[in-house]
């Protein structure tokens, strides 16, 4: 059996160079944050890189969860909420970018062989009505929050 781990360093560095060339004014930076989704799941890892006062919405139906996670869920009788709070469910890296840079960022990642799409949108918390499970304040970080809503797709 062979297990593979995707390495994101090169694509993240290329993304930073493409979106924010050296010498760019810090006020104009389009790559806002990177979140390597490891232990703790997607929402907790993403919430930690967002500043307090911001919330990201993530629609669970926005990607197809790799089959191995559904097998674990079914054979282990593990609820989706427990899986999403522990595992990455197929999303290993999230780039938080300015809205106008989203298509360019996804295109660059895909050219590098990394599947990419717009995962959600970042909002100010005062202007946002959550639609699902809100995750914030994880691992002692007083940062932003993530609203995970909808249903996972396994096919």
What do the predicted segments below correspond to?
Residues 2-155:
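Glycine-/charge-enriched secondary-structure boundary and capping motifs
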